[in-house]
Amino acid sequence: MLTTPASTLRFHRLLLTGAAGYLGRELRPRLKAYCEVLRLSDRADLSPATEGEEVQITALENKDQVLDLLHQVNAVVHLGGVSTEQPWEMVLA
């Protein structure tokens, strides 16, 4: 849980990976209080960016895409990952 008041902790650009997942969708509106620009990333489609947001579809296993994703980012909330509990095809279903 974020416990520091947004008025004292503010980043220019904050990156949220795994933004299309359950936790990412829950944190998306809350994290906007902690930054001027919230950069959202996932390999799955994301809803369109709203004011103060950037959306970037990225495969985290692609080094060049990740380096581009991190450009001018001050902080990262990393929720992106691949499920090991189920085969990838079942996770996507």
Question: What are these model-predicted stretches?
Answer:
Residues 2-34:
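N-terminal Rossmann NAD(P)H-binding glycine-rich loop of SDR-like oxidoreductase domains
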Residues 36-47:
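Conserved glycine-rich Rossmann-like NAD(P)H-binding loop of the short-chain dehydrogenase/reductase
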Residues 25-27, 50, 87-89:
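Short glycine-/acidic-enriched loop or helix-start segments at secondary-structure transitions
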Residues 20-22, 45-46, 82-83:
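Short, solvent-exposed loop/turn segments at secondary-structure junctions
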Residues 17, 41, 76-80:
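SDR active-site strand-loop-helix element
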